[in-house]
Swiss-Prot record:
InterPro entries linked to this entry: Bet_v_I/MLP, Bet_v_I_allergen, Plant_def-hormone_signal, START-like_dom_sf
Recorded consequence of changing residue 31 to V: Reduced capacity to bind specific IgE leading to attenuated allergic reactions in human
UniProt keywords, alphabetically: Allergen, Pathogenesis-related protein, Plant defense
Name of the protein in question: Major allergen Mal d 1
GO molecular function, one term: abscisic acid binding
Similarity annotation: Belongs to the BetVI family.
Cellular component aspect of the GO annotation: cytoplasm; nucleus
Entry annotated with the keyword Cytoplasm: no
Amino acid sequence: MGVYTFENEFTSEIPPSRLFKAFVLDADNLIPKIAPQAIKQAEILEGNGGPGTIKKITFGEGSQYGYVKHRIDSIDEASYSYSYTLIEGDALTDTIEKISYETKLVACGSGSTIKSISHYHTKGNIEIKEEHVKVGKEKAHGLFKLIESYLKDHPDAYN
C-alpha cells in the first residue's frame, strides 16, 4: 500500500468564521440547496456530527459518482480545521483503499486562506499522480466558489 499526498491552497474574501460555518458546519444543508447538481443529499448514518460520525453523500444527477460515505476524523471550530476520510463509495476505485482530507481555514487580511491536504491510500503498488486528482480538485474549488458567492450575496448568513 502507498500513500500519496497532494496539497491545495486558495484564498477568499470571506473571513474564516463565516466560511467554516457554511463550508463545514452547515454544508450538509447548504450545498444541496445551492448546488443540487453536485450534491443531492447529505445524511448522518451514525453519530452526532462530531468525530466518528459517518455520513453518506449522494451526488447530483449527471455526476460520475453515485455516493460516498465518509467518517469525520476531527472538527475544531476554534482553529477552523476539519478532517474526514472517504471510507466507501464509487469514488473509491479498485485501486484506492481510502482518501483522507484535512482542511484548515486561516485568517488572511479581512478574508481567508484555505489550505487543503489529501492523502490517497492505494491498494498494492498503484501510484497516484497529480493529474489523476486534478479534476476532483477543480470540482471542489468550483463548489467552494459557489459557497463563497452565496456568502457574498447573503451578507447576514452564517455570522
